[in-house]
């Protein structure tokens, strides 16, 4: 692992008691990195490591996935998506009043200037993805679970290819590596595809996890083996009575630590609301 050493004149990192709520890929990775820095870590997770969101997914490490959801094209397509019973967008109308603050921010962030800004910020975060996976897999001895052939995006029609030009320009403008492929080159990169695709672009710095479920089981086992504590209790709320500690209330009692990390996915919003913090977070599914 490449560890960040304190700069000259800075004090070493203080070792703390930390609670992590949520044991998905974000939570378990955070917990292991904290352990590696010498902190005492307690992880709260009620589900099995290889179930829930962490099961049945593609395991993609997509460094180039920095195009925001909020774009002018997304907003323009909302009416047709809602009217299509088989479309990718569905809204429970009874939930619409609660959803409006999030939707308002979505529309606001679809301005071209904000799309550029948000893409650059996402790119800055994702630039560390491959390196961080390499670090944590080295720490835990699970290095054989990654493969980096790049991410290939293919287009069957000229219309689809033309509509994607703004995405290509955005990726290039923010410094992502992109390779443009013609129909012959597509077949050389991916032999299993039928020769029906006319255009494609490849982002070579992307990869994927070969077995996401196996990875999650391995990370949880490594966390426990390295001295981490896992408690299978559901967290119901958060309290903070003083600046130096924070407590969480579970289905079985109260636990206190110096620091708290919330990585509970869509459930993070309700947990944070128990201490008056509101975040613009909604479930995608």
Model-derived regions: residue spans:
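Extreme N-terminal leader/targeting segments of oxidoreductases
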Residues: 1-18, 36-37
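N-terminal Rossmann-like FAD-binding beta1-loop-alpha1 element of flavoenzymes
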Residues: 16-42
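Redox-cofactor binding/interface segments in oxidoreductases and associated redox assembly factors
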Residues: 21, 63, 262-263
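Glycine-rich FAD pyrophosphate-binding loop
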Residues: 36-55
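Short phosphate-binding/catalytic loops that engage adenosine nucleotides
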Residues: 39-40, 176, 228, 277
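Central helical "cap/lid" subdomain
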Residues: 47-52, 250-285
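Dinucleotide-binding Rossmann-like beta1-alpha1 core, especially the glycine-rich loop
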Residues: 58-183
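Helical element adjacent to the flavin cofactor pocket in flavoenzyme catalytic cores
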Residues: 162-174, 196-259
């Amino acid at each position: 692992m490449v560890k960040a050493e304190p700069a000259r004149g800075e004090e070493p990192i203080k070792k703390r008691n930390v609670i992590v709520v949520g044991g998905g890929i974000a939570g378990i990775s955070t917990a292991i990195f904290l352990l590696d820095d010498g902190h005492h870590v307690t992880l709260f997770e009620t589900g099995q490591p290889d179930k829930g969101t962490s099961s049945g997914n593609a395991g993609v490490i997509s460094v180039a996935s920095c195009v925001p959801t909020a774009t002018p094209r997304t907003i323009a397509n909302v009416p047709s998506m809602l009217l299509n019973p088989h479309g990718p967008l569905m809204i429970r109308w009874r939930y619409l009043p609660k959803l409006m603050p999030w939707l308002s921010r979505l529309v606001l962030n679809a301005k071209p200037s904000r799309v550029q800004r948000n893409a650059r910020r996402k790119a800055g975060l994702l630039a560390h993805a491959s390196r961080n996976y390499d670090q944590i897999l080295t720490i835990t001895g699970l290095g054989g679970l990654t493969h980096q052939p790049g991410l290939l995006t293919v287009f069957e029609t000229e219309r689809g290819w033309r509509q994607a030009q703004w995405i290509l320009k955005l990726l290039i403008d923010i410094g992502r590596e992109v390779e443009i492929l013609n129909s012959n080159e597509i077949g050389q990169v991916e032999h299993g595809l039928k020769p029906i695709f006319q255009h494609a672009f490849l982002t070579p710095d992307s990869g994927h996890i070969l077995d996401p479920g196996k990875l999650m089981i391995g990370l949880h086992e490594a966390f426990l083996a390295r001295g981490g504590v896992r408690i299978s209790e559901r967290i119901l709320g958060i309290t903070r009575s003083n600046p130096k500690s924070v407590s969480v209330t579970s289905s079985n009692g109260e636990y206190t630590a110096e620091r708290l990390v919330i990585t509970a996915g869509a459930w993070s919003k309700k947990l944070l609301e128990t201490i008056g913090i509101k975040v613009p977070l909604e479930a995608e599914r």
